[in-house]
Amino acid sequence: GALPRSVSYDYSHPEHSYNLTWSVDGLVNEYIRPCRVKKDGVAMEVHPLDGLVSVILDGTEYEAAYTSGGIGSLVRDLTNVPNIHYMTLRYPGHYKYVRSVIHETHGNFESTKNIFLKKFPTTDDDVIVVYANALGKDASGFPVRRSYYNKFYGVDGLTGIQSTTAGSGVAMLELMIAGKVQGIVDHSTVSLADFTATEAFRKYYKTSK
């Protein structure tokens, strides 16, 4: 989730649980377009904003719901994983407000966008909260859980969302110059070791403020 680093939450104004830190067009797309998931080995689409859950990370409470686009090619690539889904983290109360807006606009892109522009303040003081959770079984058949959690901040005058979004593109250019990738490539096919060894990764994926 791309979030403001702090909010002053007023339950009479639930729109204050969020600030615009990136493209409002991208935000609306996340909330109104179908979401790709895989359930019991079957790829399918689910409604955006469904599946609402509460998540506590390092003592901070968030909520998460299905959003469109972020899953990328995982459903296609992870053929041996029966269940895959992608959600976006927000501060509590945000999705209830968004649902009310989309109900009011009947999911119309421009109408939803205009309300967001009027209601959500903009900020450059953002943080990118990343949480990945995997459940499975070990060789003996016992349940195992592995998770990753981190926060990423902006560097060199860039916001967190600018750094993390542009950083992967810069890393790919760095790998192309080094001859490690050629032509048009899907980011998911690039070696993780090569990607994390780039100067762009070390510079733009900053986990401390």
Which sequence ranges carry the predicted segments?
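C-terminal catalytic/substrate-binding lobe primarily of soluble NAD(P)-dependent oxidoreductases
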Residues: 1-209
